Regions:
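N-terminal, positively charged nucleic-acid-binding surface of large information/translation enzymes
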Residues: 2-216
Length: 216
């Protein structure tokens, strides 16, 4: 839709201006192609999501080139490319195998986690449970917003004030769901203080502060 080229044109103007002034400009394009909309469209059309996703990427690429935007296509990325998502999997595994040391205020390898003596005496199952309770990435029950119409989990930002789903307009409900969680609050203060040194518009930084929040 028209909103895409509007934003792309603005960054392309800056990229072209910087190039003409002798800067080495990194101006790639990529596709955030994983997601529930892609899955749902594949279900509705009876087509494998890889087929529909690749077709959409090809269409976007063709349209962007027709607009004459100066992206570096040698650096094109696609989140469904194994060469790309292997690194997101690698990051998740790193989080899973890390615990947060409050004394040093940083993450450490899970193999360095001190195990209390009473836990050791309780046996292997208790030891595993204790270790899992300290991982930065852990599996737990949590309340989520669920849209019965779309059959998907909704982010808080997708739920309107009247309790409806912004995408379909139908009511959402609260459900308990087993899911992966991250201990982001442990890093909240560091993330918040890091915003102060960024040369970003204050409105964007305030938005980030609201997203990060603080551990209470």
């Amino acid at each position: 839709h028209v909103g895409h080229p509007e934003g792309y044109t603005a960054t392309d103007i800056v990229a072209r201006y910087k190039r003409m002034n002798g800067f080495n400009v990194l101006h790639p394009m990529g596709w955030d192609a994983f997601g529930l909309p892609a899955e749902q469209y594949a279900i509705q059309t009876g087509t494998h999501p890889a087929v529909t996703t690749n077709k959409n990427c090809d269409t976007f690429r063709r349209q962007i080139k027709e607009l004459g935007l100066s992206y570096d296509w040698d650096r094109e990325i696609n989140t469904t490319d194994p060469k790309y998502f292997r690194w997101t999997q690698w990051i998740f595994i790193k989080l899973y195998n890390t615990w947060f040391d409050h004394k040093t205020n940083r993450g450490r390898d899970i193999n360095e986690l001190p195990i209390p003596l009473d836990v050791v005496k309780a046996g292997d199952e208790a030891r595993k449970k204790y270790i899992d309770s300290k991982r930065l990435a852990y599996y737990d029950d949590a309340q989520i917003w669920y849209c019965p119409s779309c059959r998907i989990v909704c982010a808080n930002e997708e739920v309107l004030t009247d309790g409806s789903h912004e995408k379909c307009g139908n009511r959402v409900v609260r459900r308990n769901l087993k899911q992966w969680m991250l201990r982001i609050p442990y890093y909240a203060e560091r993330l918040l203080s890091g915003l102060d040194s960024l040369d970003w518009p204050e409105g964007i930084k305030e938005m980030q502060r609201n997203w990060i929040g603080r551990s209470t």
